[in-house]
UniProtKB/Swiss-Prot annotation:
Gene3D superfamilies: Ribosomal protein S11 (3.30.420.80). Keywords: Plastid, Ribonucleoprotein, Ribosomal protein, RNA-binding, rRNA-binding. One of its GO terms (biological process) is translation. The keyword Transferase does not apply. Its main location: plastid. This is Small ribosomal subunit protein uS11c. The lineage of its organism: Eukaryota, Viridiplantae, Streptophyta, Embryophyta, Marchantiophyta. It comes from Aneura mirabilis. Belongs to the universal ribosomal protein uS11 family. The keyword Electron transport does not apply. Pfam families: Ribosomal_S11 (PF00411). It comes from the Eukaryota. Part of the 30S ribosomal subunit. HAMAP family: Ribosomal_uS11.
Length: 130
């Protein structure tokens, strides 16, 4: 039994992770990168807002690239070699985040677009009038 929460967190963080799943959620306002193991437990995450971008700068492709690099930095220390990528959302940072993941040297088994598409469900919001 670990003596304290710090020991428990240290023990958990040393676990090797050969394979993982990288989820990219790109909205119009932010880009969130979550990395899980194959069972779905979160290992690492990052977002444009967590990287220090605020307001309209969170929705830029550069902010998404920075968020992806921050999330992957932890994984490389844990020995991640292969990953699957799930991209959802229509945001501007989806391609840049994927490019940053490809540059990191992790072998991508597949890249899947899991954006939810309605089969004529709810009525979309009206156009902006500025």
């Amino acid at each position: 039994m670990p003596n304290s929460m710090e020991e428990m967190n240290l023990r958990r963080s040393r676990r090797r992770l050969p394979r993982g799943v990288i989820h990219i959620q790109a909205s119009f306002n932010n880009t969130i990168i979550t990395v899980t193991d194959t069972r779905g437990r979160v290992v690492s995450w990052s977002s444009a807002g967590a990287c220090g971008f605020k307001g309209a700068r969170k929705s830029t492709p550069f902010a998404a690239q920075t968020a992806a690099e921050n999330a992957i930095r932890i994984l490389i220390d844990r020995g991640l070699k292969q990953a699957e990528v799930m991209i959802s959302g229509p945001g501007p940072g989806r391609d840049t985040a994927l490019r940053a993941i490809r540059r990191s040297g992790i072998v991508l088994n597949f890249v899947r677009d899991v954006t939810p598409m309605p089969h004529n469900g709810c009525r979309p919001p009206g156009k902006r009038r500025v």
